[in-house]
């Protein structure tokens, strides 16, 4: 065991020796330095050598208000002095109460109950467990299954991973929690039917959920988990009418609709909760990342009064909880973050500028490697292809060589931190801080243009 504090110049080596990085091919850094980020300011981050990068992913879809916000840091420090920790297990503390009330006010419909977690995966896990226990309490104990979409990512806990629609991510941990079933997603760029008619495609995609409910048996299905804009695979927005049809189906078969907004909530699409942007009211919302702009970890499941009702009767208890759920410091930062959103009009800023962001990214359509540009708000994916006419994607060797071997490193080297992702077809994912302006969009486009032009020569 090492007891010496690492010298700054040795941080990269020490990281390789001791820091097991998440979702990371560790062998990549055996003979290469680990990128080490030491500070952030506004829309940019800086490494340990002083080099500046545009944060094109808001950390990990998290840093909505930008880096270096003194008011958020001060909110954390003040709360840590006043009450650093107390659980919300049969007790309350002021910041958890206030944040829960603020979220309930922002949520649509009768979603007035807030169950805090420490992150998004825990929020998804909470929603599934709550759905199961709800149906047991209401006399329908056989309703335990869930339906989600192909290629969708919903988290890493055992239940959330079962809901996830990425077989390669799940394979090492099988067998997982049984009862999670998949339907097609809303990738209209590769639609098997109705690719030229978004409304018809949306109806078809929603109807696949009904078909799966009928196939499994409506008396066995508890919930449907959907992101407003699906992240994995490269930002699939919902076709017109999709969520309205899904809501009808869920109501018809007494199935709960869970809007997984871990990424999409808190301004990413220009509204506090993304379901509002697409005009549907779910039974539960899972959220996390942007709630504090990343200045302290927290997550939540926001729940309708109807679902909460049986748990508020007699000796019934939701048999679930987390030590750090609703942590006082995180809750205080969440409140300060919501105050900042209101003060600076961040949601409206996204709505006012999302068209400019899209238009700037769509300039890349003139590159032969760019097949599709899709997304919503400040949340976009750029799908890469070998042939624009046939939409031919990369093969496995090309993905390894071009996406991993070249693009991931070269984009960062050229000053853009974003994500080159192959969880579906190869895409570049972009989600800059919500304080971004045209200057930020132009910087992203210029770096992408130069790097993708070079990548094309390597196919």
Where in this protein do the model-derived segments appear?
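Conserved N-terminal phosphate-binding loop of PLP-dependent enzymes in the Aspartate aminotransferase
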Residues: 2-459
């Amino acid at each position: 065991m090492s007891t010496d504090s690492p010298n700054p110049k040795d941080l990269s080596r020490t990281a390789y020796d001791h820091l097991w990085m998440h979702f990371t091919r560790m062998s990549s850094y055996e003979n290469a330095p680990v990128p080490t980020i030491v500070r952030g300011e506004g829309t940019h981050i800086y490494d340990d050598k002083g080099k500046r990068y545009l944060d094109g992913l808001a950390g990990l879809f998290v840093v909505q208000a930008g880096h270096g916000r003194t008011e958020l840091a001060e909110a954390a420090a003040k709360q840590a002095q006043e009450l650093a920790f107390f659980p919300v297990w049969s007790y309350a503390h002021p910041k958890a109460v206030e944040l829960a009330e603020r979220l309930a006010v922002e949520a649509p419909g009768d979603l007035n109950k807030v169950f805090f977690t420490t992150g998004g995966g825990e929020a998804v896990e909470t929603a599934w467990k709550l759905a199961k226990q709800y149906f047991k309490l209401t006399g329908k104990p056989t309703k335990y299954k869930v339906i989600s979409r192909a290629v969708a990512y919903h988290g890493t806990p055992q239940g959330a991973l079962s809901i996830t629609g990425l077989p390669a991510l799940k394979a090492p941990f099988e067998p997982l929690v049984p009862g999670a079933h998949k339907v097609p997603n809303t990738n209209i760029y590769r639609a098997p039917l109705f690719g030229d008619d978004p409304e018809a495609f949306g109806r078809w995609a929603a109807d696949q959920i009904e078909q799966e409910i009928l196939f499994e048996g409506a008396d066995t299905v508890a919930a449907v988990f959907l992101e407003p804009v699906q992240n994995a695979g490269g930002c699939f927005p919902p076709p017109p009418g999709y969520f309205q049809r899904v809501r009808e189906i869920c109501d018809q078969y007494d199935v709960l609709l869970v809007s997984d907004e871990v990424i999409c909530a808190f301004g990413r699409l220009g509204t506090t909760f993304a379901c509002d942007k697409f005009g549907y009211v779910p039974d539960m919302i899972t959220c996390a990342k942007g709630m504090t702009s990343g200045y302290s970890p927290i997550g939540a499941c926001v729940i309708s009064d109807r679902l909460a009702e049986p748990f508020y009767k007699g000796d019934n208890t939701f048999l679930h909880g987390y030590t750090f759920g609703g942590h006082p410091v995180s809750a205080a930062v969440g409140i300060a973050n919501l105050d900042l959103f209101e003060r600076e009009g961040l949601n409206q800023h996204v709505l006012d500028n999302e068209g400019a962001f899209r238009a700037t990214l769509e300039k890349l359509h003139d590159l032969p490697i760019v097949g599709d540009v899709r997304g919503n708000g400040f949340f976009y994916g750029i799908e890469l292809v070998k042939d624009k006419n046939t939409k031919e994607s990369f093969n496995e060797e090309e993905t390894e060589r071009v996406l991993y071997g070249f693009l991931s490193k070269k984009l960062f080297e050229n000053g853009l931190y974003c994500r080159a992702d192959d969880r579906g077809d190869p895409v570049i994912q972009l989600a800059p801080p919500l304080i971004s302006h045209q200057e930020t969009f132009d910087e992203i486009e210029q770096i992408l243009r130069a790097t993708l032009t070079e990548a094309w020569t390597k196919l």
